[in-house]
Amino acid sequence: MABWDKVNSVWSAVEQNITAIGQNILLRLFEQYPESEDYFPKLKNKSLGELKDTADIKAQADTVLRALGNIVKKKGDHSQPVKALAATHITTHKIPPHYFTKITTIAVGVLSEMYPSEMNAQAQAAFSGAFKNICSDIEKEYKAANFQG
């Protein structure tokens, strides 16, 4: 089970630098999974160097991290924001659910690098548990929608 209080205590620091953290997460996602760029039309077909400081990646980074933050702040009682997030990613963006696991795993790594004192082993375990819980709930929504992407 996730330690939501631990996650939220670190998340308050994340919010102070949310766009830069989101940029690092997205850039790492594109570096590790280049095919993931296909799901971000404004960002695809650009090198990581070209993307680094564009307004488009900053806007997308802000959107992604704020959506994740809204779910994290629910401390596990997140069915409504998860349903809304899944619905848009199923119908509009058509992003396969395994990308949520990829991006949240990357997020734990990036946060650990950027906030080494806050992201000790206990915090990393708390984030991993919280993100696993969130991703599992998102996958349930995909299954319920019979996603075929």
UniProtKB/Swiss-Prot annotation:
Q: Which gene encodes it?
A: mb
Q: What is its EC number?
A: 1.7.-.-, 1.11.1.-
Residues annotated as signal peptide? none
Query: Which Cys-Cys disulfides exist here?
Result: none
Its subcellular locations are: Cytoplasm, Sarcoplasm
Q: Where are the transmembrane segments?
A: none
Q: What SUPFAM superfamilies does the record tag this protein with? A: Globin-like
Q: Where does heme b bind?
A: H89
Put simply, this protein is called: Myoglobin
For this protein's source organism, the top of the classification is:
Eukaryota, Metazoa, Chordata, Craniata, Vertebrata
Could you give the subunit structure recorded for this chain? Answer: Monomeric.
Which PANTHER family is this protein grouped with?
A: MYOGLOBIN
Q: Which family does it belong to?
A: Belongs to the globin family.
Alphabetically, which GO biological process terms does the record hold? removal of superoxide radicals
Q: Which Pfam families match?
A: Globin
- Catalytic function, reaction form: Fe(III)-heme b-[protein] + nitric oxide + H2O = Fe(II)-heme b-[protein] + nitrite + 2 H(+); H2O2 + AH2 = A + 2 H2O
Coarsely, its chief localization is cytoplasm
Question: What InterPro entries does the entry give?
Answer: Globin, Globin-like_sf, Myoglobin
Record key words, sorted: Acetylation, Cytoplasm, Heme, Iron, Metal-binding, Muscle protein, Oxidoreductase, Oxygen transport, Transport
